[in-house]
Amino acid sequence: MKALSKLKAEEGIWMTDVPEPEVGHNDLLIKIRKTAICGTDVHIYNWDDWSQKTIPVPMVVGHEYVGEVVGIGQEVKGFKIGDRVSGEGHITCGHCRNCRGGRTHLCRNTTGVGVNRPGCFAEYLVIPAFNAFKIPDNISDDLASIFDPFGNAVHTALSFDLVGEDVLVSGAGPIGVMAAAVAKHVGARHVVITDVNEYRLELARKMGVTRAVNVAKESLNDVMAELGMTEGFDVGLEMSGAPPAFRTMLDTMNHGGRIAMLGIPPSDMSIDWTKVIFKGLFIKGIYGREMFETWYKMAALIQSGLDLSPIITHRFSIDDFQKGFDAMRSGQSGKVILSWD
């Protein structure tokens, strides 16, 4: 079958032929319809330090997708041929304390689709049936294909009560923009997002944020004053991994504020811990999606009127995958969809 693979330990990704995957007793075989390019896929394309330490070569990559069930393992229940599904990209062990306690998103033995095992940039994908999620009929293939990153946004945004709160989102990448849209949709008062990429800030404006602030040109404190905010932000969603952005967040949080961190900062990032201590801040690390509470919330948010369509900016046939990666690497895109039909 046709697949996009990391074939060489260097920059790039290549179209190749690989054998169709075999279906185990507890697996589903999924015929892929659409995939989306993740920032992780760009890291793998660029062959950065993380990729060199993590990705086996050769490897079929990709983990954002929607497809149709075309094969079912003999032990599987609850699915049928023809079901439209996406799936959780974190494969968990099922036997550690967190898995047995129902906190599967915190499994210490997680493996990743398209990272540690073959991914979805292929005509067919096999995953454990446990990881598959049926897509409601009134959710499009395009939106279903970005449920993985949307889930990161939902998990981060809904970590804390947002109703009537003032929310700061640092980082206007696709996940940050979607998190800001979720916060506004569920009833936050002011949702302010910061970045230095004007293209992506404009996407955030299209998604309905209160203010999208280019911190290279505008002072966040001035924006807060303009909005009548006298005590700081109640909730911070750190999506950038940029040390200056996190330090600004600590400066502008209200006392007792709550921060959810999805962005991955450098390991040697230094901050003024007195601001965390004397403000009584609560900081929560976010990894992936809660299984499967986040998935049900994603579907419900879209069905209740949350419009994510502006975040999908580019669509290509899989044969034009290079154009898709070029768009993602340029920084002048939202989500990029590759069609396998």
From Swiss-Prot:
PROSITE patterns: ADH_ZINC. It is found in: Cytoplasm. Zn(2+) 1 binds at residues 38, 63-64. Its EC number is 1.1.1.103. The active site is at residues 40, 43. Binds 2 Zn(2+) ions per subunit. Zn(2+) 2 binds at residues 93, 96, 99, 107. Its cofactor is Zn(2+). The keyword Flavoprotein does not apply. Belongs to the zinc-containing alcohol dehydrogenase family. Homotetramer. Catalyzes the NAD(+)-dependent oxidation of L-threonine to 2-amino-3-ketobutyrate. This is L-threonine 3-dehydrogenase. The gene is tdh.
